[in-house]
Design a protein with these regions (language model features):
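Conserved small helical "lid"/interfacial subdomain of P-loop NTPases
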Residues: 132-159
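Amphipathic alpha-helical "lid/sensor" segments that cap RecA-like P-loop NTPase cores
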Residues: 149-201
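Conserved NTP-binding/hydrolysis module of P-loop NTPases
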Residues: 48-84, 278
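Conserved P-loop NTPase "ATPase switch" module shared by AAA+ and STAND
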Residues: 79-105
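Accessory nucleic acid-recognition modules appended to NTPase machines
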Residues: 188-348
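Walker A/P-loop nucleotide-binding motif
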Residues: 24-43
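Domain-level recognition of nuclease-like catalytic cores that cleave nucleotide substrates
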Residues: 398-440
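N-terminal pre-P-loop "Q-motif" helix
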Residues: 3-18
């Protein structure tokens, strides 16, 4: 609830600033995708400070005034009536951006200026014909989750955020008194909020979700180039391109330039975020019944697989964010960028690196250990050392080594060298790295 209290204080500051100075807008858009807690925040604010709340959900916008206040046929009449309240209330309007017929509602809103403070709860920022403030609600992060659940292991926090994208509505489904594996069975059940969230979002965005489900399932299971998706789905490539653009517009698609099997740089397509990857890979094929009969051993096997397919990918994103912010801890001679696909996924004398970058005086090596249950092992570093020093002396190489677990003692000793940075999950969630998670 600390997150909600923080947003509530931010909203209260907007309201207070407006009434004290009259120089700030009389309306705020409270933005956040489904499940971020917009309605929870409105409820919390109303309990603390009073006000009014109206939802346009399942209502024709033109008909809504009659529902909200008997005898009011038009929005201007409704606003005139509630504007007579003497205590200058804060008025919340929920589900506003669901409506295509909201022109009269928007045009009539200025009648409340000076009489009330208006908060619009929306998923996406709306264009309005008058000034407004914005509060953007974002997802929970690993540091937030660990702060609220101090007994929670960092690895389980990583897993939780990885498969929920930190969406509060989904995170709260977890019982952190149980193991991560024990949480999966009720989480993936056909009547759980985890299962229903995807269905609801797909129906909201598409008239025929079934068409897009095929492509999202294909992407989640390894068909990531447009030619592969076309072959998998049976759709011509031009139709795939059209559907991919629609998925992108809905915020459900991410693209990455990376090497294909032949080493050529190609566009690869993925469901956006770990929740959608998890849902389409593990929940969608069996429509929520996958885990109902699974026993402890099978659940643990599923956790093992998810660690390799979902969790490690999220961990890598955290590592890249840390690297962009902190590479100067080992490299002081200039600026580095790590987004060139030609420098990603490079083999050096039989050892694969996540990134290899040549500079005038050094070679930069990045290795992210892809077993999230382990620390960086001695044998792996010895292979790295042998492969890289065959190209260039050790002191001319700079190594960034990441692992979720604490590295072995041998590798921990190596971190004392100026050209080696060893980073684990526990150090990543420190206070100084909060923005590393906020960028995800």
């Amino acid at each position: 609830m600390e997150r909600i209290r923080s947003y509530r204080a931010q909203l209260y500051a907007h309201v207070r600033s407006h009434w004290e100075s009259k120089s700030t807008p009389w309306i705020t858009q409270l933005c956040g995708k489904s499940g971020m807690g917009k309605t929870t925040l409105a409820r919390s604010y109303l309990e603390a400070f009073n006000g009014e709340y109206f939802s346009l959900r399942n209502l024709d916008a033109a008909f809504a005034p009659r529902i909200f206040l008997s005898g009011c046929k038009l929005w201007k009449d409704f606003f005139a009536e509630i504007g007579e309240t003497k205590n200058r209330p804060v008025i919340f309007f929920d589900d506003v951006d669901d409506k295509n017929d909201k022109k009269d509602f928007i045009n009539a809103l200025p009648a409340l200026a000076g009489k009330a403070y208006v908060v619009l709860l929306v998923r996406n920022l709306m264009e309005l014909p008058f000034p407004f403030d914005v509060i953007q609600m974002t997802a929970m992060t690993m540091p937030m989750l660990l702060a609220e659940n101090r007994a929670l292991e960092p690895l389980d926090a990583l897993r939780t955020i990885a498969i929920t994208d930190g969406i509060p509505e989904l995170v709260r489904l977890f019982d952190f008194q149980k193991s991560f594996a024990e949480n999966l069975s009720p989480l993936f059940a056909h009547d759980s909020a985890y299962f229903c969230y995807a269905e609801s979002e797909l129906r909201r965005n598409f008239r025929t979700p079934e068409t897009y489900n095929i492509l999202l399932y294909g992407m989640a299971t390894g068909y990531n180039r447009i030619s592969q998706l076309s072959e998998f789905s049976g759709f011509p490539q031009n139709k795939c391109d059209k559907y991919l653009k629609a998925l992108d517009k809905a915020g459900l698609l991410e693209t990455e330039q990376k090497k294909d099997a032949a080493g050529h740089i190609r566009t690869h397509y993925y469901p956006k975020g770990g929740y959608w990857k998890t849902w389409f890979r593990y929940v969608f094929p069996s429509q929520g019944r996958y885990l109902e009969v699974q026993k402890e051993e099978a659940l643990q096997q599923l956790v093992d697989e998810m660690d390799k397919t979902i969790v490690v990918e999220y961990f890598k994103k955290v590592c890249w964010n840390w690297l962009e912010k902190n590479y100067h801890s080992c490299y002081w001679d200039g600026f580095l960028k790590f987004d060139d696909p030609k420098q990603r996924d490079v083999m050096v004398n039989g050892v694969r690196f996540d990134c290899v970058q040549e500079t005038k005086d050094h070679t930069i090596y990045v290795k992210i250990w892809d077993n999230v249950r382990e620390g960086f092992p001695k044998e792996a570093f010895q292979k790295i050392e042998a492969a890289t020093t065959a190209v260039r002396p050790f002191y001319e190489n700079i190594y960034f080594l990441f692992s979720a677990g604490r590295a072995c003692n041998y590798v921990e000793e190596v971190r004392n060298l100026e050209t080696v940075s060893v980073v684990n999950l526990k150090s990543l969630v420190g206070q100084k790295n909060k923005d590393v998670f906020e960028k995800l």
